[in-house]
């Protein structure tokens, strides 16, 4: 048992302006006011504890220091703010605690601090007294470049999505997770070598259940203890920045779990959520939905988003399940939802919350990314606020993902009849600032790995995967690939095991990784491949109509930079003397061929290049190519 803290609690004051801003929902550093913080009072040092529980009958501090007995260390109301606070002299750094909240219903619940900075390892749910002020950053050059560059709409963004708990694991008995330092030593060189510009971490805030992958967050301000301390995560981000790699976090403001120790019914009432389950509960996930109309709840979430940018220097947040926030009838049958004041299904409070969130984030941290996982056709998700948009930097292109995977699943014999699945995305490619995602959602729950979705024998499956990756990297939009996809993983992902890294011993699988590296290289090095990812000036169809041969071709453009021309053959038939329109006459170099033996292909190609001639009849230019089977060819002018 820990040494008792003899003094108990005494009242302490909070700055009136802090309380005022919190009541308005506009205190961006509220996590430095509420929660547990080192404090000096009346000549003594210790910790100040503060928690918002406006409907509670009583709140006290419990922990090993008082054998978890409620009532021994009472907190005191701070005026009429709904905040309870108290000072404990002699309380030290690194001590476990919880709040014992006697709710409006008379029940005493032991609650995790909503503003906890660090928590114990699951299944424990207590918080530690902690500090935010001990880490010295070494990424000033990166942060300055990010500020000066602004949002990366015209920059290459290629994201490697990963689950920190399964990218690398300890084997044998005991704790299965590696810490952030161990992960950094292996992951950062790997990602850098593969040419990705950013890492996206699935949620790293504390969560009780491994199988939730972090999407049911229990403590929003506490990096999970599975991988080390908050400073360990800071060091991981710092090291990424020093190696030129950005870090994006998945963030979950759409819902939270019903666990009794967490935010739900925090003071015996529906405090963070709506009371009516038609508004306050999510039927798919069995979770609570935040009350976005309550100032203090909005403040909790606004400040949390800013917290990751300010205290952890992250470069972006990917907001999960945005569609579930926008629609009151999301995944609900008639009678299971309530319309808004205008009779519609739009969640007006959530819409206002998202718009204000993006305004504040971009105002406070220019150059960072706010990315929406939004699966419907809601207009203007990534359009500016002044045009009526939601203000996100990017939106996941779920339509492109579904159509592409649907097309690639087809036997090549039948692809001619699905040709529109391949070309339809260009009708809306510039309606939003899109990220093309091949994410974790596509390789779990019986969906199979990307490679296993491909038709044909083993060679054809691998060729199809290489072809799909080339199509993805050539298509307008930023890129996202989930871990394991770069080596042609056969098994679908599980949070309890690593990718099958042994596959890298096989040339065909290492060839897929080589291709991803080279695709990232072309994407980053050729301005035509990324500068106009979000407008028509960077794209031109050469031929989209040859559905009979399942061949398409297009070119990418940027001012003061040579174009890059792409030709795709979605059948296993080698097509010789295939005539393709091209942007200009002269010599063209073959800069990438997914059928190269280096990638695991059959080495059918064009001898390193081709010559484009002028078509005197039509006044354009063309070249005749040999199209490899199930392959893509990229060319640029010499």
UniProtKB/Swiss-Prot annotation:
This is 1,4-alpha-glucan branching enzyme GlgB. Belongs to the glycosyl hydrolase 13 family. GlgB subfamily. GO terms for molecular function: 1,4-alpha-glucan branching enzyme activity; cation binding; hydrolase activity, hydrolyzing O-glycosyl compounds. SUPFAM superfamilies: (Trans)glycosidases (SSF51445), E set domains (SSF81296), Glycosyl hydrolase domain (SSF51011). One of its GO terms (cellular component) is cytosol. GO terms for biological process: glycogen biosynthetic process. The active site is at 320 (nucleophile), 373 (proton donor). Catalyzes the formation of the alpha-1,6-glucosidic linkages in glycogen by scission of a 1,4-alpha-linked oligosaccharide from growing alpha-1,4-glucan chains and the subsequent attachment of the oligosaccharide to the alpha-1,6 position. Keywords: Carbohydrate metabolism, Glycogen biosynthesis, Glycogen metabolism, Glycosyltransferase, Transferase. Monomer. It catalyses: Transfers a segment of a (1->4)-alpha-D-glucan chain to a primary hydroxy group in a similar glucan chain. Pathway: Glycan biosynthesis; glycogen biosynthesis. Its EC number is 2.4.1.18.
